[in-house]
Amino acid sequence: MTFLKKGLRLLFAKHLEGWRRAVFLVIVWIPLGVIMFVAACNLWVIGSTHRFIAKDVKSARVNQVALVLGTSKKVAPKRANLHFRNRLKKAKELFNAGKVQHLLVSGDNGTRFYNEPQDMRDALVNMGIPSHAITRDFAGFRTLDSMVRAREIFQLDSVSVVTDGFHLPRAVFIGRHFGLDVTGIASDPVPLRQSFKTHLREYLARVKAVLDVHLLNTPPKFGGEPEPIMVSR
């Protein structure tokens, strides 16, 4: 009987130790691995693109076209989106400085009531940009879509991309992966209290970008026939 009790105790102890190891793996090593993977992807995206991002308009490279990445015009019915305003302001600065001759505004037009490219065009025209110097891409549902379509649909080999500073590395990373000679210029920063969640999401979005281009081979939502941009001023 004593022998049986000892055997049961040993068996129980082995199972308990196994459970402890499993719990330790789940609680510590798996989350640690995820954190390290997220960090590695972010370092890759940022580290491989920083040299292609201009410090200001003066140092920005001259290109025929600037790609302005879309966002919503408002964040609430009576509250303007500062990301929207600042991106267009920077695009206007590039245009007026002679750094670009044409603006490609790319964004979400998922419903008849939501049209980022049209909102961007209307705002830019009100800011003094000639309408003939603006092309709309109505299928820029994601950053990947906008970058790939700039290359494949609008037949651009080189482009200056305008968006928020935290967003630029991902845009440049995706564009250059698909053979687009991309340089970036950051719009003026939005106060962190109004953009904190967006900054946090970007850490995971960079991971998704790495997976999209190097593992999943994710295509844009919509393709189409080539529509080369004819630059005139």
How would you name each of these model-derived features?
Residues L32, L94, V213-L215:
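Enrichment for repetitive, rod-forming helical segments
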Residues F24-N42:
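Hydrophobic membrane-insertion alpha-helices, especially the h-region
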Residues H199-T218:
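A transmembrane-helix-recognition feature enriched in membrane-embedded lipid enzymes
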Residues R21-V26, Q194, T198:
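Residue-level signature of transmembrane alpha-helical entry/exit and packing/kink sites
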Residues K5-F24:
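Cytosolic-side transmembrane helix boundary signature
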Residues F3, G7-L11, C41-L200:
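A structural signal for short, hydrophobic/glycine-enriched beta-strand patches
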Residues N63, N217-R233:
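Short linear elements at protein peripheries
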